[in-house]
Amino acid sequence: MTLLIIYAVLSIIISFICSILEAVLLSVTPTFIRVKKKEKKAYVTHLEHMKKDVDKPLIAILTLNTVAHTVGAILVGSEAEHVFGNGGNGVFIVSAIMTVLILVVSEIIPKTIGATYWKKLGSFTAIGLKLMIFPLRYTGILWILTQVTKLIGKSAHVSTMSREEFIALTDAAEQEGVFDDNETGYDLSF
């Protein structure tokens, strides 16, 4: 029973970290990166490179997350069969519990945390992703998977702000009181 719990907890912890990293990476904005560069935060250079080439960190996250889920399911299922036997409902119950835990504890909760606290988790994410990418880069796995994504995506991750988005952003900032009275009323119909 101890091994079953260890396998389940390890699988969920690894997936939890992957989900936080993914949510933070996808939530970080170019403006945030510029602000942190002006503040001379050391981690922001890594974060900026990852945002510019988002396929590589996403490949690392999804690879580790898939391995955690797959190996975790195999080990937990095997150990559940060893503990509860082949004929009873024990394996089914363990599988159902594991499915709910993976969904809630390693997907929904960490992605909510990452999307909510992404500004505070920027440094953690930059370091975590750098460590996660390292083994994939030096085994060649990252290169192979990057080539696959290039066949499908072809630079689909370009981040630019359109005129409409800029106007909507300034309108929202004005409505939320970000600007002083003397800073509003500019004609943006250029």
Mark where each language-model region is.
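Membrane-embedded alpha-helical segments of inner-membrane proteins
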Residues: M1-F179
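Long, charged amphipathic helices and adjacent flexible linkers at domain junctions
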Residues: N182-F190
